[in-house]
Amino acid sequence: MRVLVRDLKAHVGQEVELLGFLHWRRDLGRIQFLLLRDRSGVVQVVTGGLKLPLPESALRVRGLVVENAKAPGGLEVQAKEVEVLSPALEPTPVEIPKEEWRANPDTLLEYRYVTLRGEKARAPLKVQAALVRGFRRYLDRQDFTEIFTPKVVRAGAEGGSGLFGVDYFEKRAYLAQSPQLYKQIMVGVFERVYEVAPVWRMEEHHTSRHLNEYLSLDVEMGFIADEEDLMRLEEALLAEMLEEALNTAGDEIRLLGATWPSFPQDIPRLTHAEAKRILKEELGYPVGQDLSEEAERLLGEYAKERWGSDWLFVTRYPRSVRPFYTYPEEDGTTRSFDLLFRGLEITSGGQRIHRYEELLESLKAKGMDPEAFHGYLEVFKYGMPPHGGFAIGAERLTQKLLGLPNVRYARAFPRDRHRLTP
């Protein structure tokens, strides 16, 4: 029966079978040292007289587990049998044991199918999986229902910009930029819903913080009083996500040298107007209606200095910079918010309009065609609760938590302005 590397300590003095990849090799003639890597770690294997295959070959090893203080982890396996299950046919383009994951991003991404085998390259994905697990678990406990919405749609949730068009038989369709309209519809069914799924944005940006395809963690909740209910929910949700990652992916977090954030019980809040005033009067950085990347970075520094917080809610954005479905106030603001983490927007959310006439008026005011949203609008003729929600960008959150230099390292196979493979 197979034993994982992490469990070898319980088998000292016993014969075991290991399955994994040849991580490294050293041939001293009569004696040969191998490092065997499986999903749980690396162990030294001592053998001799073999014609050693290339690194990354898949192996089966049968041998005796013994203690050796000089070996990685203090253990080694003295092999009695080594079988090559699948040989590597050529050297890897990047040496996995000498992994330098912060350098040469084009090379690392071009050969992602190999470089992901490196422990530092795969660590962000392990952390992200834990974050998503915490996301699901917390919402399940709060009586949310997971939903699965269409990804080929007739119109975008936020209008006609930023959409990837696709041919859908004799019609024109688009890749979904958000499940927004569907999750609102499903609030009328389950009251509380969430989805974990990819979304697409056709944006020309080619920066360390932008992806054209990313994993969106979406939440929508009915019968709320206002957007404050949503921010309170997100505070508790993020706390559980961070705890799950720390508890189950702590080795990966430490491997990357990440500074794990403290999580305040109450995230500081600034209205959009207050944020603009602080930027202009205290930080010397005037801004327009929306906040630029630099403005968000400065606000992140301000929150850290003033409150000791890595997190900051910016609330009450102007109606002009929010989607048509955002609940408006009479003063021209909206019941909306963004969550900044270490100076980067990772969440956008707010309360939605829940009355048919007001929603129709808002669509027209934005210059959008109500007919394109017919199925969505019809739902509001039959009663909808006051509701709202938010979406967390999984890759951005992972990037900032781990201090990754590029958001592409937080996705297994990233899609950006220039990358369509692998």
Swiss-Prot record:
Primary localization: cytoplasm
Induction of synthesis: Constitutively expressed in a constant ratio along the growth of the bacterium.
Localisation per UniProt entry: Cytoplasm
Catalytic reactions of this protein: tRNA(Asx) + L-aspartate + ATP = L-aspartyl-tRNA(Asx) + AMP + diphosphate
Pfam families reported for this sequence: tRNA-synt_2, tRNA_anti-codon
Residues flagged as site, Interaction with tRNA: R26, Q44, N68, E76
EC number(s) from the headed UniProt entry: 6.1.1.23
Keyword ATP-binding tagged: yes
Additional remark text: Aspartate mischarged on tRNA(Asn) is then converted into asparagine by the tRNA-dependent amidotransferase GatCAB.
Stated family: Belongs to the class-II aminoacyl-tRNA synthetase family. Type 2 subfamily.
Protein name: Aspartate--tRNA(Asp/Asn) ligase
Gene source species: Thermus thermophilus (strain ATCC 27634 / DSM 579 / HB8)
